[in-house]
Amino acid sequence: AGIGKIGDFIKKAIAKYKN
């Protein structure tokens, strides 16, 4: 449980670093 939330958080973090 919570894998979806963690995945979304990682996606947002990656987008932040790439931006």
Swiss-Prot record:
UniProt entry tagged with the keyword Metal-binding: no
Coiled-coil stretches: none
Gene Ontology cellular component list: extracellular region
Tissue expression as described in the entry: Expressed by the venom gland.
Keywords linked to the UniProt accession: Antibiotic, Antimicrobial, Secreted
Location within or outside the cell: Secreted
Chief location of this protein within or outside the cell: secreted
Superkingdom in the source lineage: Eukaryota
Reported function: May inhibit growth of bacteria.
Protein name: U1-lycotoxin-Ls1a
